[in-house]
C-alpha cells in the first residue's frame, strides 16, 4: 500500500546566450528579472527574496545581493551578454548594475525606462505636520 516516490521533473537548461536584465528599483524594494529577447523570464530575484525585510530591502547592498543571485541563476542557463533596462527611482539602480558586471556578464547597453507621466493624475492633498 506504500505509494511510489514521485518523480520530480528537473528544470531543463535553456541555452540562451543573450538576455535582457530588467531592474525595477522602487523606494521600498529592488527586483531583478532576466529574460530572453522575447521577454520570457529566465531568472528573477528581489531584495525581499534574499531575506532582507523592512527598510533594509531598499538599500544598495540588498539590490547587489539580489542581482548576484539572479545573475548566477541566468548564467546556469548559458546567458553571457545582457542588455540592462533600469526602471524606477530607487537606491539600488547602480549597485544592481555593478553586481551584474561582477558576476561576469558582458553588458551591451543600459537603458532607463522609468515611466514619466505627461502630468498624469491629480496629487493627493498636502500633508500638514
Swiss-Prot record:
- Annotated Gene Ontology cellular component terms: ribonucleoprotein complex; ribosome
Q: Which InterPro entries does this one have? A: Ribosomal_uS11, Ribosomal_uS11_bac-type, Ribosomal_uS11_CS, Ribosomal_uS11_sf
Recorded hits in NCBIfam families, A to Z, give:
PRK05309.1 (NF003698), uS11_bact (TIGR03632)
So which domain of life are we looking at?
A: Bacteria
What PANTHER family does the record point to?
40S RIBOSOMAL PROTEIN S14/30S RIBOSOMAL PROTEIN S11
Q: Which GO terms fall under biological process for this protein? A: translation
SUPFAM superfamilies in the record: Translational machinery components
Spell out the HAMAP family in the cross-references: Ribosomal_uS11
What keywords appear on the UniProt entry? Ribonucleoprotein, Ribosomal protein, RNA-binding, rRNA-binding
Family per UniProt?
Answer: Belongs to the universal ribosomal protein uS11 family.
Name this polypeptide is given: Small ribosomal subunit protein uS11
Purpose of the protein: Located on the platform of the 30S subunit, it bridges several disparate RNA helices of the 16S rRNA. Forms part of the Shine-Dalgarno cleft in the 70S ribosome.
- Supply the gene name: rpsK
Subunit structure, as described in the record: Part of the 30S ribosomal subunit. Interacts with proteins S7 and S18. Binds to IF-3.
One GO MF annotation is: rRNA binding
Amino acid at each position: 500500500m506504500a505509494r511510489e516516490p514521485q518523480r520530480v521533473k528537473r528544470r531543463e537548461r535553456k541555452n540562451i546566450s543573450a538576455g535582457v536584465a530588467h531592474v525595477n528599483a522602487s523606494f521600498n524594494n529592488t527586483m531583478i528579472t532576466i529574460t530572453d529577447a522575447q521577454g520570457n523570464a529566465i531568472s528573477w530575484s528581489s531584495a525581499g527574496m534574499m531575506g532582507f525585510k523592512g527598510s533594509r530591502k531598499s538599500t544598495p547592498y540588498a539590490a547587489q545581493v539580489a542581482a548576484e543571485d539572479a545573475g548566477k541563476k541566468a548564467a546556469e542557463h548559458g546567458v553571457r551578454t545582457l542588455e540592462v533596462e533600469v526602471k524606477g527611482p530607487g537606491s539600488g539602480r547602480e549597485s544592481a548594475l555593478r553586481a551584474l558586471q561582477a558576476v561576469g556578464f558582458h553588458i551591451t547597453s543600459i537603458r532607463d525606462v522609468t515611466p514619466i507621466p505627461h502630468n498624469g493624475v491629480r496629487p493627493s492633498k498636502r500633508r500638514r505636520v
